[in-house]
């Protein structure tokens, strides 16, 4: 996990190694659970202890077990996918996984995963901690919107095309194939 320090609202700075710079690789991935918000609202990051209590409300007697299973599965998935992406020239700086339970109580993926919409992908080439990184994700469109606050949230065609090109480049790097 390479996120910048501002991305950790549930973390105290004392939880992180000293001397980190923006975009530094963390020694180990950080698991940050969140609750699923209503449509239109933002998911809320919570502590691991809060995740146990939250799960306990819905699954009495299972909160601790499910929280541990979610944490362990999330970190294992991230590590496996991050290693693969790295072998293809991409750093997965951060990502989110959404899980649910099926009718038998088995954990299942509940939404997209490891897409440019749910992750931050950086090229290995040119990676240099200490500042923001170029990316293959929606950050380009976000940055454009942020730098044009008077805009009515309409992206110009060239920004849309550049975002599409970034997604396609990422796809090709990961799969080795062109998207038709």
For each feature predicted by the language model, list its residue ranges.
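A long amphipathic alpha-helix within ATP-dependent nucleotide-binding catalytic cores
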Residues: 59-93
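Short, small-residue-biased leader/transition segments that mark boundaries at the very start
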Residues: 1-13
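A non-catalytic, amphipathic alpha-helix used as a structural packing/dimerization or gating element
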Residues: 1, 69-80, 162, 166-170
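Conserved metal-phosphate-binding beta-hairpin within the catalytic cores
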Residues: 92-113
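Charged phosphate-binding loop/patch that engages nucleotide di/tri-phosphates or the phosphate backbone
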Residues: 176-180
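Anionic ligand-binding catalytic core segments
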Residues: 11-65, 113-174
């Amino acid at each position: 996990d390479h996120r910048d320090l501002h991305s950790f609202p549930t973390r105290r700075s004392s939880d992180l190694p000293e001397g980190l710079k923006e975009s530094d690789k963390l020694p180990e991935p950080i698991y940050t659970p969140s609750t699923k918000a209503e449509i239109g609202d933002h998911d809320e990051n919570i502590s691991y202890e809060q995740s146990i209590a939250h799960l306990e409300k819905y699954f009495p007697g299972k909160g601790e077990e499910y929280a541990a299973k979610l944490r362990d599965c999330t970190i294992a998935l991230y590590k496996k996918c991050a290693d693969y992406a790295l072998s293809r020239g991409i750093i997965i700086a951060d990502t989110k996984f959404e899980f649910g339970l099926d009718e038998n109580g088995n954990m299942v993926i509940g939404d997209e995963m490891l897409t440019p919409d749910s992750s931050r992908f950086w090229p290995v080439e040119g990676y240099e901690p200490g500042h923001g990184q170029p990316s293959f994700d929606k950050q380009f469109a976000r940055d454009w919107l942020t730098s044009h606050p008077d805009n009515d949230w309409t992206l110009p065609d060239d920004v849309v095309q550049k975002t599409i090109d970034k997604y396609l480049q990422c796809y090709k790097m990961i799969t080795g194939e062109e998207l038709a």
